[in-house]
Amino acid sequence: MTPLLAFALTYAQFALALAACLAALRILLGPRAQDRVLALEALYVATMLLFIVTGMRMGTPFLFEAALVIAVAGFVSTVSAAKFLLRGEVIE
């Protein structure tokens, strides 16, 4: 791994960790439920990308599979939360 790539991956890890912390703060302090749902989606994306960057840094494919599971769980939870906010129930 070149020093430039190592620096870029380290910087990306810190930036994504900061984004995840700020999204978690937005979940706790969001004034409306819609803000909390968007912050949850941002948290899922930041966590997924953090797993991918860490997998690139470690050179292991196992974290990519974990990132895929996080992406699917994030999609399902976002769709169900949006449906609940829109109609007031998830299952009709």
Curated annotation (Swiss-Prot):
PANTHER family: NA(+)/H(+) ANTIPORTER SUBUNIT F1 (PTHR34702), NA(+)_H(+) ANTIPORTER SUBUNIT F (PTHR34702:SF1). It is a multi-pass membrane protein. GO terms for molecular function: sodium:proton antiporter activity. Keywords: Antiport, Cell membrane, Hydrogen ion transport, Ion transport, Membrane, Potassium, Potassium transport, Transmembrane, Transmembrane helix, Transport. Belongs to the CPA3 antiporters (TC 2.A.63) subunit F family. One of its GO terms (biological process) is potassium ion transport. GO terms for cellular component: plasma membrane. It holds the Pfam family MrpF_PhaF. The chain crosses the membrane at residues 4-24, 37-57, 62-82. Part of a K(+) efflux system involved in pH adaptation. The gene is phaF. This is Probable K(+)/H(+) antiporter subunit F. It is found in: Cell membrane. The keyword Cell inner membrane does not apply.
